[in-house]
Swiss-Prot record:
GO CC list: apical part of cell; apical plasma membrane; cell surface; cytoplasm; Golgi apparatus; Golgi membrane; membrane raft; nucleus
Annotated protein name in UniProt: Epithelial membrane protein 2
Taxonomic lineage: Eukaryota, Metazoa, Chordata, Craniata, Vertebrata
Gene Ontology annotations of biological process type: actin filament organization; actin-mediated cell contraction; apoptotic process; bleb assembly; blood vessel endothelial cell migration; cell adhesion; cell-matrix adhesion; early endosome to late endosome transport
Predominant place of localization: Golgi
Native organism: Mus musculus (Mouse)
C-alpha cells in the first residue's frame, strides 16, 4: 500500500510539474532562431515581444483566443495543485474504505482545462500567425515545441491521475 501511495504522489507531482513547465516556458511554437508561447514571441535570444503589450496598429489580433489558452492553462495548474492539497487532507481525514472522489473531480477538471487550452491553440495557431504577420513573419516555418507537447502529456497524466483517485480507496 505504501508503494502505491508513493507512486500516486510522485505521479501527481510530475503531472503538476508538466503543467507548470508547459504554461511558463517559451516553446509552444519553435524554429531555428525563434520561439513563441502563450506570453511572448522571441525572434532571437534577445529580441522578445510580450503579446499583451502591443497597442495601436500593432495590437495583437485574436488576443482573446490567446487569453483563453492562457486562462485554461493557468486554471489547470491551479486545479492540479488544489487537488494535490485536497488529496493530502483526505489522506488523513477520510474514513477507511472511502474513495478520493473530491480529489478525482478536481484533477479531472484540471485535465479538462488542459485539453481545452491545448485544443484551442492547436485549432487557432495558424489563424493567429496569419492575423499577426508583423509579429510572426519569421515563425511560419516552425513546428510545435516541447511546451506544447508537454501540455498534451500533462493532459494524459492528469486524466490517468484523476481516474486513479476515482478508483483508489483509503486503507489502513
Amino acid at each position: 500500500m505504501l508503494v502505491i501511495l508513493a507512486f500516486i504522489i510522485v505521479f501527481h507531482i510530475v503531472s503538476t510539474a508538466l503543467l507548470f513547465i508547459s504554461t511558463i516556458d517559451n516553446a509552444w511554437w519553435v524554429g531555428d532562431s525563434f520561439s513563441a508561447d502563450l506570453w511572448r514571441v522571441c525572434t532571437n535570444s534577445t529580441n522578445c515581444t510580450e503579446i499583451n503589450e502591443l497597442t495601436g496598429p500593432e495590437a495583437f489580433e485574436g488576443y482573446s483566443v490567446m487569453q483563453a489558452v492562457q486562462a485554461t492553462m493557468i486554471l489547470s495548474t491551479i486545479l492540479s495543485c488544489i487537488s494535490f492539497l485536497i488529496f493530502l487532507l483526505q489522506l488523513f481525514r477520510l474514513k477507511q474504505g472511502e474513495r478520493f472522489v473530491l480529489t478525482s473531480i478536481i484533477q479531472l477538471m484540471s485535465c479538462l482545462c488542459v485539453m481545452i487550452g491545448a485544443s484551442i491553440y492547436t485549432d487557432r495557431r495558424q489563424d493567429l500567425h496569419q492575423q499577426n504577420r508583423k509579429l510572426y513573419y519569421l515563425l511560419q516555418e516552425g513546428s510545435y515545441g516541447y511546451s506544447f507537447i508537454l501540455a498534451w502529456v500533462a493532459f494524459a497524466f492528469t486524466f490517468i491521475s484523476g481516474l486513479m483517485y476515482m478508483i483508489l480507496r483509503k486503507r489502513k
